């Protein structure tokens, strides 16, 4: 476990005279442009694990403040199979398994992945513009727009901050100060009615239909793209207008060869304004101090694990 990296460090402490301007440009394009970017060629095959973690942490200084990714306060997450999907529960976070991850966003302004090892087969990364999905549904099924902007209960997947309920309300479509922020998390909507039937109403037929229409629209080849990312590739995504997924994968047999990614959840200080109801999940809406699973905003008290761990205390 690494805890020595400074939470007060700035770009001046990690100078990158050539790469730094490119990192800033990619982040700007993610925040106010196309919403995603890919950087290729980091020499992770010859770096040690600690070197990879330090380099990736250095990238974060150019992109935003790190946020806790689970109740163990991981600031750099390890996306790797640590739970056999045949034994996984409905509340297990899918990034810990080899099962396909449906279209979703992460609980941060920006999310980044650094690819250390790829799977034997599968594990494709998919991206789609949630703004394009919205426009297409508005064109073809305008009756579903009020449904998507209505009340949606989401499960916390057993990561419940003190004083909070195991579920919360967050609309899919959120208009605020000139921005349309779209929060989409398939599989998180279906759980609360099943787990808390006395508190959470079942999904309506209109909501069920809206989920299916969203899935079908996002998966259209003229709307989504799929990429086979290689070791040393870094992706950066804006969660407010890009949804992403991952196909199921078959992993290598040897433990040293298994699919392994590092992940950052980031909150830039110049991020867009968000409505107050995001606070229930994000712990606040102040840019630079929001996001994560709601236990604490900001990097203070966080840790940098060297290897994948089960991030949920209760699986």
What residues fall within each predicted segment?
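Active-site environment of non-heme Fe oxygenases that use a 2-His-1-carboxylate facial triad
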Residues: 1-19, 24-25, 32, 37, ...
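"Short basic amphipathic alpha-helical interaction patches in structured regions
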Residues: 50-57, 127-129
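A short alpha->loop->secondary-structure connector
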Residues: 56-66
């Amino acid at each position: 476990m690494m805890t020595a990296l400074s939470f007060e460090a700035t770009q001046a402490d990690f100078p990158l005279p050539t790469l730094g301007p490119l990192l800033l440009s990619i982040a700007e394009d993610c925040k106010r442009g196309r919403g995603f970017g890919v950087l290729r060629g980091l020499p992770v095959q010859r770096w040690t694990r600690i070197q990879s973690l330090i380099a990736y942490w250095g990238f974060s200084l150019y992109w935003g403040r790190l946020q806790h990714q689970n109740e163990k306060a991981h600031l750099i997450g390890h996306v790797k199979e640590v739970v056999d999907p045949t034994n996984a529960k409905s509340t297990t976070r899918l990034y810990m398994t080899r099962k396909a991850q449906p279209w979703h966003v992460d609980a941060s302004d920006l999310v980044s992945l650094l690819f250390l090892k790829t799977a034997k087969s599968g594990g494709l990364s998919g991206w789609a513009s949630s703004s394009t999905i919205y426009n297409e549904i508005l064109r073809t099924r305008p009756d579903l727009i009020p449904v998507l902007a209505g009340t949606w209960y989401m499960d916390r997947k057993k990561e419940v901050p003190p004083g909070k309920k195991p579920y919360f309300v967050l609309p899919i479509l959120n208009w605020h100060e000139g921005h349309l922020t779209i929060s989409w998390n398939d599989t998180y909507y279906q759980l609360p009615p099943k787990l808390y039937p006395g508190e959470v109403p079942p999904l309506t037929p209109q909501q069920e239909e809206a989920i299916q229409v969203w899935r079908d629209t996002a998966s259209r080849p003229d709307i989504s793209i799929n990429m086979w990312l290689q070791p040393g590739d870094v992706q950066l995504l804006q969660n407010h207008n890009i949804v992403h997924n991952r196909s199921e994968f078959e992993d290598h047999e040897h433990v040293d060869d298994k699919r392994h990614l590092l992940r950052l959840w980031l909150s830039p200080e110049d991020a867009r304004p968000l409505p107050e109801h995001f606070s229930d999940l994000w712990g606040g809406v102040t840019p630079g101090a929001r996001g994560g699973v709601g236990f604490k905003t900001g990097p203070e008290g966080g840790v940098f694990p060297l290897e994948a761990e089960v991030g949920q205390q209760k699986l």
